[in-house]
Amino acid sequence: MGNVAGSAVEERREAAVLPGYERLGGAAPVVYPPGLRERAAEARDVLAAGSAALSEILGVEPPDLEALLVADADWGRAPRENERPYPPGLPYFTRAARPPALVLPETLSSVFRPRTAATGALVLWHELAHAFLLREPLPRTPAWLRELVPQALSAAVARRTGLLLERHLEMIDREPGFTARSFGRHADANGQMAFQNLLLALGDAAVEEFGEGFLRALAHELWEETDVVGEERAQALLADSLGPGGREWLASRPEI
């Protein structure tokens, strides 16, 4: 899941979410099935590093949550808000568990591309960023802004933890046939992945150009919004959070 290491205190006890599952305690607890303890420890370390970084970047305390590493055979029984299970292999954040949980699949879906040493950690940090952002009510926003913030946060965490992104970013298709703003919500899984990758590239470029401070400003602005955020307002929020030169920089970016 990446090369982030940690040393959280370990705890093993029976977990109530799924029968037979145990729990690794620490700053980022992970509930896991028999036979996947090593994977659980790896996920815990990646999440602990991400949680500490996101807390500093956003200026907030980490949310109360734990990760649930689910065996492929148990995927249909994982906690969720919806009646139907999520597609196999797709991580997600849910409040259907107590505490809320990041649900992680034993086998990551093949739709996640590119596959590099950074893929696993980026996926975990992306879902963790959503959990941080959902600590407060968020307004409805265009899809590109809703997903850009966690992608940019993932890139910022990677920079803080020393996870090398160069190879991963080099393998991203920068010309998928659409921009972040023109992307259609009814695209297939491959299109959705191309959309997310485009936003990761844009988010990393923004952090490179303006530093990570704009992410705190943008997140807090979104938490304070009370109305639906339309396209024009979304662009203004992002540009203003970037600071001087933000509007001109955005206008020059092919991704947007």
Give the label of every model feature segment.
Residues 1-21, 254-256:
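N-terminal low-structure segments adjacent to metalloprotease catalytic domains
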Residues 19-125, 131, 135:
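Juxtacatalytic substrate-recognition/specificity segment
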Residues 57-70, 137-143, 165-168, 215-220:
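Surface-exposed patches in mature extracellular/periplasmic domains of secreted proteins
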Residues 107-112, 175-189:
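Acidic/His metal-coordination segments adjacent to aromatic residues that form catalytic metal sites
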Residues 129, 133-137, 154-162, 207:
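Hydrophobic/aromatic-lined pockets within catalytic cores
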Residues 138-149, 190-194:
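Active-site metal-coordination segments of metallo-dependent hydrolases
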Residues 143-182:
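Post-HExxH zinc-binding segment in Zn-dependent metallohydrolases
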Residues 183-256:
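Pan-zinc metallopeptidase signature
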